[in-house]
Amino acid sequence: MKVWIDVLTPKQANFFSVFVARLREHGHDIFVTTRKYREVEQLLQIRNTNATVIGRHGGADLSAKLVESSKRIADLAEHVTKKKPDLAISFCSPEAARVAYGLGVPHYAICDSPHAEAVCRLTIPLSRKLFTPRAVPKSAWKRYGIASPNIARYNALDPAAWIHAYAPG
């Protein structure tokens, strides 16, 4: 299966680096995108996860955020169209959710932050499934229009995905 993963933050770089390695071990073809963000790019490099840098964050200004997000959507659409993934996975990346939806690619969201209203409003309704820690009640997600059967909960907090790989020095 060909899987597209979009990584936006240092936490996501840690989380998805382990995730990418496991998917590859199971024979999946993975391609990763990120936006221009020095810490994310460095973490992905340290963790041997190749990523294509597409776009940047618009900063604190709402207008700049909107413009940069729009540019990134257009650039991602072009890139992803060429790659032809079977599914997309992101930690609620608005651009990944929008591009996947627009291209008819199922988007699977991972999120532990139902309080991040803007991001959730832009991603959850476009996602086929939401994966979230069991500590977050399903009811916290319902206001974003996702049906309870489409919410999968796991028994861990997200750092558990990468912390176990490190032995005390």
Where are these regions (language model features)?
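Nucleotide-activated donor-dependent transferases that construct or modify glycoconjugates
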Residues: 1-10
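Structural motif
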Residues: 2, 86-87
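Short amphipathic alpha-helix
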Residues: 10-24
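Conserved nucleotide-sugar phosphate-binding/catalytic loop shared by glycosyltransferases and other
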Residues: 24-68
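Short, well-structured alpha-helical segments in soluble
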Residues: 72-84
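Active-site proximal beta-strand in glycosyltransferases
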Residues: 87, 101-114
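A conserved, positively charged/aromatic
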Residues: 108-109, 120-132
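A nucleotide-sugar donor-handling region in carbohydrate enzymes
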Residues: 131-169
